[in-house]
Amino acid sequence: VNGIKKASPSVVGITATRFGVESVERASDDQLNLYLEEQDSLGSGVIVSDDGFILTNLHVVDNLFDLFDTEVTLNDGRRTPATVIAWDKANDLAVLHINMDNLTPIEIGDPEKSRVGDFVFAIGYPRNIGQSASLGIVSAITNNTDSTVSIIQTDAAINPGNSGGALIDSNGSLIGINSSIFSESGKFEGIGFATPSSIAIKSMKELVSRAIEANSGYLGVITGEALTSESSQIFFGRDNIRGMLVESVDRGGAAKRAGIKPGDVITRVEKTDVVNAEHILKEIRNKKPGEEITVQIFRDGKTLTLLTNLGFGEARIIDPTVKD
């Protein structure tokens, strides 16, 4: 019980909303020819770092790359958007990233110390009913040629939605990522499999390193027009405010965490005074995800200086006067 209590804050549910192609076929002549249909794709994931990296199975998210909303739910009820940043097909693993404070990364265990008969718990979000845990034992261990663990077999129930969740030992330490079941009926028959945490964590570190190297940072704001003397006078009653007017802020993004709000004006980023969108893009693209950035804003007649750590995403600002 103590092990479950310790590990449960680190296990999340994964929900995705995507385009539904079935809706086009069902549309009648008097309906819209195309509309959006929300569909939930459910799975689980494990928080493995306090800066927002989550491990899950690739098959949980491999059909979600074109979706318009991916979200994770924490054990405490908080929900936040997530970005799939990298994946490992060979080991059926994927890494997500979220921008959120006060995360509880799971303690990493040593699957090499596991023995057949050890008690284990599978924690996940089966069938959209919230987080649950199932008890089982290590049924079998398959080793590589160098005697390291390659797969853990367990009879702890891995039901639909549990994929990508945590297999923990009695101390609450992660020893595997729940991945699949063997079943002729499609239902759980007491034969489940987990990727050892040693393999999963090694893969995750390599994937994250490559993802950071390949991506520039992401602030998470949509800006409107660049302020001129005329628009500054209209919006703020004075003609000397220059910068980019913030129209919206990504939920869970770096800008949101910094406290940036719609209606703010971004006047300076790092040491660059902002006159148009390119000035913001230049500074963001010079930094990697996770790096700190200084943003100066104008709000309610005052100039504020905010700090935040950039996230993952495409650094692109919507501004009709600037082509990215």
PLM regions: where:
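Active-site loop architecture of trypsin-fold serine endopeptidases
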Residues: E38-Q39, V60-D69, L103-P105, I123-I137, ...
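Conserved active-site neighborhood of the chymotrypsin/trypsin-like protease fold
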Residues: S49-G124, N128-S132, T145-S150, P160, ...
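N-terminal activation segment of mature serine protease catalytic domains
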Residues: V1-S28, L34, S44, F53, ...
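Short loop/turn microsegments at loop-to-beta-strand junctions
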Residues: L42-S44, F68, N162-G165, M244-V246, ...
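Gly/Ser-enriched beta-turn/beta-hairpin loop segments
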Residues: E22-E38, I85-N91, A140-I152, F182-K187, ...
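Conserved hydrophobic positions within beta-strands
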Residues: G45-I47, A82-V84, V138, V246
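A conserved glycine-rich beta-strand in the N-terminal activation segment of trypsin-fold
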Residues: V1-N2, V21, L32-F53, R79-P81, ...
